[in-house]
């Protein structure tokens, strides 16, 4: 153990010298200690008390600065030195109050050893030390773990010399690397799809000119983010993926307008200037409305808000920079390249036929819609109500905190309070054997068993009756949930532990348990009974698993109170009696000394094995003021009784928190909590002083839903103000915002078709989508208004704007969808966190754009007709 500890300390120091590491937390490593262990019976026979031994050591074993001495004009420091790192020096100290013939070594055994352990760790059955490496602020996590791996490899080459081997049990960068790879792959695929769409509709040269601004936009975005102390992480990459398709939207609209004019014989400079005149206002309004939808999401409170705050920042910065690229750099590129149509080959002929075909088919359908306006509107309304019906009927599965699992899980073991640490460790090792038997060959990177501590999702729990098995899995293999379900029954069949639960970690923002119920009351026995009822309810609720609570049964205690009369007659001071009791039971740290950078405590304590029962302790003898001996039982009143364990309070009342996990394939957070509420309603009368507070993930969901709703309304309000300023109208912004419920319809349809759950990330995507979906309507209504100002009739202007804008709308919608399609479909890797955001935008934008092409012109025409009729009747 000493050599293991020395190696662990050496490794800890070597790692901490590296700049990327903030600190290293150790587990299973006891502190060094010098113990002065006396025989209580022997010192009593010599007329000594435990405090005599402790005071002797404390008095001699000290360093004292006595001041300065003036010696021939120089100041000399005067120090009294008594401390030593040699444990045997303590043996020579004479017991105070004696003639010097009796020394510490005559009544006690002095040894250099280790403090009593509060934790025991085993790896493959061998004593081990766990070292948890914490990175310094701003350090690159991936570089740090690579550095640690190199250190492990170098250290293990010297295993024959050091006698120790390092094993990496838990690598938290594995999910990070996986997520980064998913984002990078999907970003690359998305970029390629964007270029393909632009090439199909606009040709290679124009597609290249459109895409050439993307590196500039991303470089500017990353430069600004670096100035704001942001790092490149998964959420930043998600913002890039979301923005990727939209980055070329501005350029597509501008370059399509230029392309349209070149087709009609405009010169290069005239085509650019006329196109900019037409597109600056609507494109700027479209970008600002998108920013208005995204930016308020930075104000989202709670865990979800902190985790995803950077996404709207990335998207907003990138979109604003894209305006600079579209209105300044792109026209320069176009003029420099000499905007000409591609050669009149088969590809260009196909492109021309495609654009004309889209306009022709669209105009035929739009004219039919204008002839049957109420049928078209009825279809849209029915689609909206159908989406609401799918949600209300439960056809869309809800999993508000859907997350990607981490390849690590824990098996938690609890025994009866007061169980010795060694006994708990032995039971934990039995559990470890069963766990290993249920794992495939090479499936685990490492399995560690330890007692005295349990890691949780929030804070570690300590106690000699707690044990835990940590299982680190290989990056690829069976799902963590499947592994746990397969071994659950066999692990729980191991005799001995009073409770066995599993803890499965998940990626994404930290979240509470799906079920977390605070049982509050004043009477502890009634509170305990009510908590047991809640546990029974949860055990009988479908889809609920790993039920636990934080109530701790107390251990038996020997309660001692001083007898004032007896204490007075003995002539002993109460403080001296209390000190002697502490020295007899747990010992007293009388001093400490520094040795090679470590603090070594000096503990005076009765030798082990002297007090195996309360009776033996109470029989300990203490010398009185007259020199007579008196037993401890004569000085104190003793009461043997059970005690309460940890008693927690919430809002000034005693509280037991009952928690459980759920199988999201069977139930969801809201449904399972509702089941408990209904079952408790039938039992509540039996527990009049007890009430329940439902918190945990339910609180997080409610907070996020409330906040997302408020920010959604706020974003719509800002969008309305921007559109009102752009169009100088109160009514036309409302026509544009009609696209938002249409987008919601598409999101619900997408969830239903793909089988994805409704999560808070999906709702996040819906709010973001509200700013994207309006862009098509903006450019269409802007074109119609321009035609009206130019003197066209209402119907002619509506049809002209629709025909003129349908191709750029199709292109921008397809490029946005193309940028996110890979992430939504999982082409470059799947994610339960980011996939729903992309799915919401892809389906919502696709569905709303189709309806927008018909509903917006129709509403524009109908409201315009109504205004004309009102004006004519007024005249």
What does each model-identified segment do?
Residues 279, 348-399, 517, 803:
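Signature of alpha-helical transmembrane segments and their immediate interfacial
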Residues 244-258, 279-299, 306-348, 469, ...:
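Transmembrane alpha-helices and their membrane-interface boundaries in multi-pass membrane transporters
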Residues 12-189, 199, 255, 535-715, ...:
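Extracytoplasmic/periplasmic membrane-proximal domains and adjacent transmembrane bundles
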Residues 41-62, 66, 81-83, 422-510, ...:
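Solvent-exposed, membrane-proximal periplasmic/extracellular interface segments of envelope transport
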Residues 169, 176, 180, 255, ...:
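Helix-loop junctions and hydrophobic alpha-helical segments within the transmembrane domains
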Residues 230, 298-306, 381-419, 478, ...:
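Transmembrane helices with small-residue packing motifs
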Residues 2-30, 52, 398-472, 486-489, ...:
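Extracytoplasmic/periplasmic
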Residues 192-260, 317, 718-805, 810-826, ...:
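Hydrophobic transmembrane alpha-helices and their membrane-interface caps
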């Amino acid at each position: 153990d000493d050599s293991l500890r020395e190696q662990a300390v050496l490794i800890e120091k070597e790692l901490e010298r590296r700049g990327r590491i903030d600190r290293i937390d150790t587990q299973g490593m006891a502190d060094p200690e010098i113990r002065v262990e006396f025989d209580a019976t022997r010192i009593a026979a010599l007329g000594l008390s435990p405090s005599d031994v402790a005071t002797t050591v404390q008095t001699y074993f000290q360093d004292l600065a006595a001041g300065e001495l003036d010696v021939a004009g120089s100041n000399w420091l005067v120090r009294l030195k008594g401390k030593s790192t040699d444990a045997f020096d303590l043996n020579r100290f004479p017991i105070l109050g004696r003639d010097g013939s009796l020394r510490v070594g005559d009544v006690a055994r002095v040894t250099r050893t280790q403090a009593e352990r509060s934790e025991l760790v085993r790896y493959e059955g061998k004593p081990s030390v766990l070292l948890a490496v914490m990175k310094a602020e701003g350090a690159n996590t991936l570089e740090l773990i690579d550095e640690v791996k190199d250190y492990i490899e170098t250290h293990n080459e010297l295993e024959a010399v050091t006698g120790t081997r390092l094993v990496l049990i838990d690598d938290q960068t594995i999910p990070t690397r996986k997520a980064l790879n998913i984002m990078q792959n999907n970003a690359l695929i998305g970029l390629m799809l964007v270029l393909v769409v632009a090439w199909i509709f606009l040709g290679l040269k124009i597609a290249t000119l459109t895409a050439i601004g993307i590196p500039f936009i991303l470089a500017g975005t990353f430069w600004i983010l670096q100035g704001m102390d942001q790092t490149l992480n998964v959420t930043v990459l998600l913002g890039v993926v979301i923005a990727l398709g939209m980055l070329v939207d501005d350029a597509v609209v501008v370059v399509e307008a230029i392309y349209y004019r070149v087709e009609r014989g405009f010169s290069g400079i005239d085509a650019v200037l006329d196109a900019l005149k037409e597109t600056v206002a609507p494109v700027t309004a479209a970008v600002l409305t998108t920013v208005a939808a995204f930016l308020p999401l930075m104000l989202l409170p709670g865990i979800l808000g902190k985790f995803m705050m950077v996404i709207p920042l990335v998207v907003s910065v990138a979109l604003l920079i894209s305006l600079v690229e579209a209105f300044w750099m792109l026209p320069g590129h176009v003029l420099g390249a000499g905007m000409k149509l591609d050669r009149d080959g088969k590809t260009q002929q196909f492109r021309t036929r495609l654009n004309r075909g889209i306009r022709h088919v669209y105009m035929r359908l739009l004219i039919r819609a204008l002839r049957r306006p109420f049928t078209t509107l009825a279809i849209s309304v029915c689609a909206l109500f159908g989406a609401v019906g799918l949600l209300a009927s439960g056809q869309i599965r809800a999993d508000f905190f859907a997350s990607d699992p981490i390849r690590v899980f824990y098996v938690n073991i609890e025994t009866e309070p007061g169980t010795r640490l060694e006994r708990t460790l032995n039971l934990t090792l039995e559990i470890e054997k069963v766990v290993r038997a249920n794992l495939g060959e090479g499936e685990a990177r490492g399995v560690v068993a330890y007692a005295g501590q349990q890691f949780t999702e929030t804070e570690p729990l300590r106690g000699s009756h707690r044990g835990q098995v940590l299982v680190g899995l290989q990056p690829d293999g069976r799902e963590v949930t499947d592994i746990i379900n397969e071994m659950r029954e066999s692990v729980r069949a191991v005799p001995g532990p009073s409770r066995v639960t599993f803890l499965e970690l998940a990626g994404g923002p930290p979240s509470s348990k799906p079920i977390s119920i605070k049982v509050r009351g004043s009477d502890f026995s009634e509170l305990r009974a009510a908590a047991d009822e809640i546990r029974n309810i949860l055990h009988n609720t479908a889809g609920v698993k790993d039920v636990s609570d934080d109530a701790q049964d107390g251990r038996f205690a020997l309660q001692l109170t001083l007898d004032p009369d007896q204490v007075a007659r003995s002539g002993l001071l109460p403080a001296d009696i209390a000190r002697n009791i502490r020295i007899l039971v747990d010992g007293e740290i009388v001093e400490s000394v520094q040795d090679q950078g470590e603090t070594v405590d000096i503990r005076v304590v009765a030798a082990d094995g002297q007090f195996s029962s309360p009776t033996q302790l109470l029989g300990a003898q203490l010398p009185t003021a007259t020199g007579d001996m008196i037993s401890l039982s004569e000085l104190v009143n003793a009461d043997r009784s059970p005690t309460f364990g940890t008693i927690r309070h919430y809002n000034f009342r005693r509280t037991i928190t009952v928690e459980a996990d759920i199988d999201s394939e069977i139930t969801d957070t809201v449904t399972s909590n509702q089941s408990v509420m209904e079952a408790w309603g039938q039992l509540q009368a039996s527990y009049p002083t007890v009430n329940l507070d439902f918190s945990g993930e339910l609180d997080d969901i409610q907070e996020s839903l409330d906040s997302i709703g408020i920010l959604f309304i706020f974003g719509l309000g800002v969008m309305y103000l921007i559109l009102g300023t752009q169009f100088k109208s109160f009514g036309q912004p409302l026509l544009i915002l009609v696209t938002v419920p249409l987008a919601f319809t598409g999101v619900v349809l997408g969830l239903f078709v793909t089988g994805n759950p409704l999560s808070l990330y999906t709702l996040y995507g819906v709010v973001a989508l509200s700013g994207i979906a309006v862009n098509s309507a903006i450019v269409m209504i802007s074109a119609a208004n321009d035609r009206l100002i130019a003197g066209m009739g209402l119907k002619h202007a509506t049809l002209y704007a629709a025909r003129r804008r349908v191709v750029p709308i199709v292109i921008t919608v397809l490029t946005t969808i193309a940028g996110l399609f890979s992430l939504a479909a999982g082409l470059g890797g799947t994610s339960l966190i980011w996939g729903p955001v992309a799915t919401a935008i892809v389906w919502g934008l696709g569905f709303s754009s189709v309806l927008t092409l018909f509903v917006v012109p129709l509403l524009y025409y109908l409201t315009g007709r109504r205004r004309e009729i009102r004006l004519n009747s007024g005249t």
